[in-house]
């Protein structure tokens, strides 16, 4: 069997990759026209604490179907870890149709789209994750989606939010 990488290492690698891409994007930035930043809700001082995916699936679908949906989310996560992004996207698209209020589904689907280079779709799902959780956790990836679309104002807004949410912020 294939050994799994520890979760923090993979998460750090993805964040580092996104931060490097944004640094490259700063060099590409053209002072020409850029679409206006989206009108976003302001984030509270701390993220919203939501129930686990298992609870949300069971609330939305019932005990039996909720348990199956949780298993499918696990399958999608394994496909993502193995870089089988098409498989992960297929599973997650089925889940998001029925359970768009489960942040783990939105987050993973946004990351799948990001890794596939589907910037607009990735941004859509990660924005939904941001609104639902009030978290800045995926801001580097979301900002890179906007950088790829040359939406510089959105990139700037996200970096300001991330800076303001940082524990070392003044």
Report the location of each language-model feature.
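TPR-repeat structural position
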Residues: 85-86, 119, 152
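Solenoid-like repeat scaffolds
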Residues: 58-65, 93-100, 127-134, 161-169
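TPR alpha-solenoid repeat register
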Residues: 105, 138-139
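Alpha-helical segment of the N-proximal tetratricopeptide repeat
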Residues: 62-97, 108, 114
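Coil-to-helix interface segments in alpha-helical RNA-associated scaffolds
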Residues: 149-156
């Amino acid at each position: 069997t294939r050994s799994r990488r520890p979760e923090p290492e993979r998460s750090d690698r993805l964040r580092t990759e996104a931060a490097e891409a944004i640094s490259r994007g700063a060099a590409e930035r053209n002072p020409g026209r850029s679409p206006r930043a989206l009108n976003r809700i302001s984030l509270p001082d701390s993220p919203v604490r939501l129930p686990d995916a298992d609870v949300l699936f069971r609330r939305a679908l019932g005990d039996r179907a909720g348990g199956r949906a949780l298993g499918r989310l696990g399958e999608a996560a394994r496909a993502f870890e193995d870089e089988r992004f098409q498989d992960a996207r297929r599973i997650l698209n089925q889940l998001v149709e029925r359970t768009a209020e489960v942040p783990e589904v939105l987050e993973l689907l946004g990351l799948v789209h990001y890794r596939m280079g589907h910037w607009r779709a990735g941004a859509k799902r990660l924005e939904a994750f941001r609104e639902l959780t009030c978290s800045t956790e995926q801001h580097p990836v979301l900002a890179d989606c906007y950088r790829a679309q040359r939406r510089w104002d959105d990139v700037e807004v996200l970096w300001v939010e991330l800076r303001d949410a940082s524990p070392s912020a003044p």
